[in-house]
């Protein structure tokens, strides 16, 4: 089995359905004997360019290990899901289990927001 990194972008109006979508894709992978090494929900982010007149979308990254049949099934699911605006599947040399650079940035932003919120709470 080969290792893959999958990033898919979901329509912002469908953000509340993202956890269910992730579970569905995880079930597809594990039911065919694959493994999931990392799942990161990057949240709603600014798009680099407009897609279907949208400026923001919900990003999800998955690192998996599966066979070609499972990968074809996942790609088919992405293509025919109207909520998925774009998807990208990249073959990796080895499993990636640590946080991605994008997730590190998300964590840094959350830490800044938490630090900014603390002084206002202390003043109140």
Swiss-Prot record:
Keyword Ribonucleoprotein: yes
BP term (GO), one: translation
Highest taxon listed in the record's lineage: Bacteria
Source species of the chain: Burkholderia multivorans (strain ATCC 17616 / 249)
Keywords: Ribonucleoprotein, Ribosomal protein, RNA-binding, rRNA-binding
Compositionally biased region (Low complexity): 114-124
Pfam families (UniProt xref): Ribosomal_S6
PANTHER family in the cross-refs: MITOCHONDRIAL 28S RIBOSOMAL PROTEIN S6 (PTHR21011), SMALL RIBOSOMAL SUBUNIT PROTEIN BS6M (PTHR21011:SF1)
Protein name per UniProt: Small ribosomal subunit protein bS6
Region (Disordered): 96-124
GO molecular function: small ribosomal subunit rRNA binding; structural constituent of ribosome
Family assignment from sequence similarity: Belongs to the bacterial ribosomal protein bS6 family.
Function: Binds together with bS18 to 16S ribosomal RNA.
An annotated GO cellular component: cytosolic small ribosomal subunit
NCBIfam families the UniProt entry points to: S6 (TIGR00166)
